[in-house]
Amino acid sequence: MKKLRIGVVGLGGIAQKAWLPVLAAASDWTLQGAWSPTRAKALPICESWRIPYADSLSSLAASCDAVFVHSSTASHFDVVSTLLNAGVHVCVDKPLAENLRDAERLVELAARKKLTLMVGFNRRFAPLYGELKTQLATAASLRMDKHRSNSVGPHDLYFTLLDDYLHVVDTALWLSGGKASLDGGTLLTNDAGEMLFAEHHFSAGPLQITTCMHRRAGSQRETVQAVTDGALIDITDMREWREERGQGVVHKPIPGWQSTLEQRGFVGCARHFIECVQNQTVPQTAGEQAVLAQRIVDKIWRDAMSE
């Protein structure tokens, strides 16, 4: 089988910490090149990772079968549109675009072009979350908290909902089966319109779902708790599993070989996209799944603005 030619757009902090270590460990693909509009900053990064620097987005597209996009959210629509129109498959950081209409237009464009367009919701590929999903058939309650130590501002409410709270909503809805309805919730902002706190309630049949985030909680902790028929399961920071059944408590150790990037789902996410392109299969977070959580976050924001 011909090796897939992979490219990267955007070389900021997330790309360097989470994606380049995975993509540079190429096995059944080749890392062809990278492009960023800030050439002066991009060149040293490309040199340290031994990745060729492309002179333009179009030249990168011409040399690649698929591209990972890690540029700013504001650039997503233009960058992804250009790549899709050039016949290139795309995996892009969430959110798909900075507004819902543009996100839906990108999904429609990918469908017309018969190309793979996937949103990189890495938590869907975190091994412990994947294991939890298989044990929720009898769940009565599912709660996900993702807090920040001190991250109020400088962006407005809409930006923070789309940039960070989106992860919580997408993960919780995916764990529940993705067919939940929004029942209500609370949003608190400061006088500058910056998000302080969010908590929302959903239902999926008998299952009750809660999502929660505080921007100045003094902690970066992320937890998921499931209450099922016969068990209480807690997952902390995607690496600690605590399960109670009757009188017994079970702590599942993380495999020694498992890297932090694998625990957090980045490895699984990248490989899933590449395998879908190679095998011409549909990714988990393509089509409707690519915009499901964004559509709900957009409604949460619109409801808050109308109050």
From Swiss-Prot:
Keywords: Oxidoreductase. GO terms for molecular function: nucleotide binding; oxidoreductase activity. It holds the Pfam family YceM-like_C. InterPro entries: Gfo/Idh/MocA-like_OxRdtase_N (IPR000683), Gfo/Idh/MocA_oxidoreduct (IPR051317), NAD(P)-bd_dom_sf (IPR036291), YceM-like_C (IPR048477). Its EC number is 1.-.-.-. Belongs to the Gfo/Idh/MocA family. This is Putative oxidoreductase YceM. It comes from Escherichia coli (strain K12).
